[in-house]
Amino acid sequence: TAVGVALETGQTTGLLIGDIAFLHDSNGLIGLARRGADVRIVVVDNNGGGIFSFLPQRTSLPGGQFETIFGTPHESDASLIARAHGVRSCEARTTAELRQALAEVGPSVIVVKADRDKNVEHHDEIHRAVAEAVRGSIKV
């Protein structure tokens, strides 16, 4: 869809996508480099289905079953997949690197590595802070 938007509008278009979705949709990279679509694809690579780490099954399934069934680790390299299709790619390790990569004209795949467990912990911290703020502001 993002490639279609970029081609139809002629405008720079951004796409934020998870690694599993990127792998499923990587055929969209075919011919991208020669189409003239200025699309910047940012791949959040947590080596699997990070969204599923928020499910209760994460802590209730024995052993490595959760990883096998829901985590779906893949060990694929999104940058190599992009380059195989002639699309420029890089890994952004800092905010400055991400900004620099996003500023480059032309189609590109920018990979941002993430840790699934830390992502869940961070969301839990935010959830607790919001809940505390709401409780503090409601007089019951």
Sequence positions of predicted segments:
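Thiamine diphosphate
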Residues: 1-140
